[in-house]
Amino acid sequence: MVKYYCCAGLLKSTWDQVCVAFWQRYPNPYSNHVLTEDIIFREVTPTNCLISRRLLTKTSRAPRWMERYLPKHMASSAYIIEDSIVDPQKRTMTTLTWNISHARLMSVEERCEYRINPDNGSWTEIKREAWISSNVYGLTRAIQEFGLARFKTSVTKTMKGFEYVLGRMQGETPSRTLAETATERARETALAAKEKAKDLASHAHKKQYV
């Protein structure tokens, strides 16, 4: 059984600005959990759409009751694949993100669509959908509730991070100074581990956007 969640967001910046900020989001004070990001591939289609795939390494501390279901070396980090397509003619950007780590325990798939706000052409609206599933017998509901709560927290941080980067792009004084995204040891560990995950990301099944 899959738990579905949907929400909307609004950024008071143009669609073009948001698209630029999307590729410059990290680091920001609200993304301490993002350790690394790598572009796996990128191409421009005959219709001038930009298609990209990124591999993200994030910290992902599980609650104690979940840790026993995870390998010790994977209990504190996760690999995420992010596919995106930017359509300059339709003025839309669609992203699809899903985890390739811990997927047997819990799978979180997110789809976002960025488009011009119909009421104000200088603003950008975001439709965000998530599908959270787990097949752990007896713990499915608890794991899904945990995943949903963490997802909602992540959305809040994502929006604040966007606003921070957009403000910096537009010359505003940031409300907070840049925090360290991780300790050097965490970064070194993530850099070593991500090499193994790159192969998984490059062979992962391409998701559909419709």
Features from the language model and the residues they span:
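A generic structural signal for short beta-strands and their flanking turns/coil linkers
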Residues: 35, 48-52, 78-82, 91, ...
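Eukaryotic helix-linker segments that join adjacent hydrophobic helices
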Residues: 55-76, 80-83
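Hydrophobic ligand-binding cavity/cleft-lining segments
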Residues: 1-63
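Generic alpha-helical secondary structure signal
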Residues: 19, 30, 34, 83, ...
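Terminal "cap-and-tail" regions of soluble proteins that handle hydrophobic small molecules
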Residues: 2-8, 69-76, 85-210
